[in-house]
Amino acid sequence: MNPTASSTYAAGDAAGYELQMGRWSRRLAPGFVDFTEIEAARRIIDVGCGTGHLSLALVRSPRVEHVTGIDLSTAYVEHARSRSDDSRLEFVVGDACRLPFPDGWFDHSASMLVLQFVPDADAAVREMRRVTRRGGTVAAATWDSRGGLVFLRVIVDTAAVVDPDADRLRAKLLSQPLTRPGDLRRCWGNAGLLDVTQDMLTVRMDFECFADFWAPCEGQEGPLAAYVGRLSTDGRTRLRALVQRAYLDGEPDGPRSYAATAWMVKGKVP
């Protein structure tokens, strides 16, 4: 799926997404669910469900009766469906900015690591509020791309030193919607949600070696892979060598663990 008016993320390879970001979504989801305090519900919607990590975390509670995950990417939805035979889970293809559900249909709505890729994120949040009943929770999480995503800075800061195109990519990635301090709180307030609370959650991104760290850049999923894929063979070889130096930081190749911090917000529908 190419970028659209509703998403700047080129999604199409579910396995590639799992390698690039899904494995970290899996780590983030339980803590985000704890933050939402959603423990019981007849119906919950996971907006921009991707490959299903948040939906799977939500149904860990036996008091959650049904979770609908919705995503623009057919490939992601099919992958999510394949991950569980839990009858409480449903995954459908659809647009976060035009949710195909009536007003107040869900008890709660949540979105994880998605809104930063929605050009009109305010519209998506308004839709989340619309389909959530009065008194229900609307919650979201986005990466702190500039100050809290070490793996990203290792790559884009290195690339930006030697390539103006990478410098422009860095500027784009570090200025995505709803990734700066206070952005989510302001957005939730503008949407008319009440009792708005913002917090942070940090997980660890653990890599076995540099090859594990670099592998997503050689794939086909996400903005980093797209950038690397446009480079010449010599350009890719040069960039890989430079990023490897940054990863090794003077020590032998092997495991590295980087912090990854997400902003989280929740509010109530009046």
Task: Go through each PLM region and give its residues.
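Class I SAM-dependent methyltransferase Rossmann-like catalytic core
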Residues: 11-22
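Conserved alpha-helix/loop element of class I SAM-dependent methyltransferases that forms part
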Residues: 23-42, 57
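Class I SAM-dependent methyltransferase SAM/SAH-binding core
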Residues: 43-99, 123
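A generic alpha-to-beta junction signature in SAM-dependent methyltransferases
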Residues: 36-38, 62, 84, 132
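Conserved Class I S-adenosyl-L-methionine
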Residues: 3-6, 10, 24, 51-53, ...
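A short SAM/SAH-binding and catalytic strip from SAM-dependent methyltransferases
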Residues: 107-121, 144
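A short acidic, Gly/Pro-enriched loop at the edge of an enzyme's catalytic core
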Residues: 97-108
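Conserved catalytic/acceptor-binding region of the Class I
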Residues: 122, 129, 133-208
